[in-house]
Structure formats: C-alpha cells, structure tokens
Amino acid sequence: LIIMDLEGIFGLFGFSEENNKKKLKELEALKDTPRFKLGMFHKLVMNSLIFKKQTLKFFSKSSPKLDLDDIDTAGEFMVYTRAYYWIQDFKIRSKEWKLALKEYYSDEEFLCSLKLTINYFESTEEYEKCAFLKKIQDLVIKNINTNKNEI
C-alpha cells in the first residue's frame, strides 16, 4: 500500500499551504491601501456603463416583461453605492491618499468617474457625498493642471 502525500504533490506546483496563507495576507494588506480603494472606485464606475447595457439587454428579453426603468434605477443604486464604499475612506489631508491619487489617478478618466458619481448623488439628493467627492475632484483637477504645467 502506497500512501501519497497530497500536500507534497501540490507543493510541486507552487500551491503550498504556507504560500497560500502568505498570499492571502498580502492581498488583505493590499485591499487596505489608498491605491487599491481608488482603483476599485474607478473600476466600478467605468465598468458600470458596460454592465448597464448588458443588464438592460438581458432583462428586455425576459418573459414576462419587466420594468426596465426600475432595473436601471436599482443597478445604478448598487454601482454608485458600492463605488462610494471604496472611496469613502479618502482622507483629504493624508499624504498617503494624496500621493496615490496624484501618482495613479490624476487623469481625465478618473475625473469622469468622479463627475458621474457626483451627478448620481445629486440626483438622489445625497449632498454630503457630493461635497466629499467634490473635494477629491478639486484635487484631481489641481494635479492635472500641475502635470500640464510641468510638461
């Protein structure tokens, strides 16, 4: 009778238990960084436009017919609420947050994400969120203008 050491076999492929735990800790630490949180905010907003089209197309073919306006409204709520979750920890006076914003997200595309999110929260009359996002938007605009002047 031969007894196989499965952990040893899978270890040959780089899947050791210790390695997995280390990677999980690294990923958890990454999720707490300003760069990651800003990136998740941006990705959710930008991908929401594609998601919206796909969702509406899918439900338009359903039987019985569903109210596409309600589906669109629910989808927007989910996207922008979740996107805000990722950016709500932004600290205006934090060097770490400002540096992540300046180095990775001070461009027109990120500015578009902020504007879309501000417009959504204006439509739902959540003005505190709008004011918070406007401060970040102002920093992005300042960084964009500074980068233009350096060129």
Regions of interest found by a model, annotated:
Residues 2-122, 138-151:
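Long, low-complexity, acidic Ser/Pro- and Gly-enriched intrinsically disordered regions
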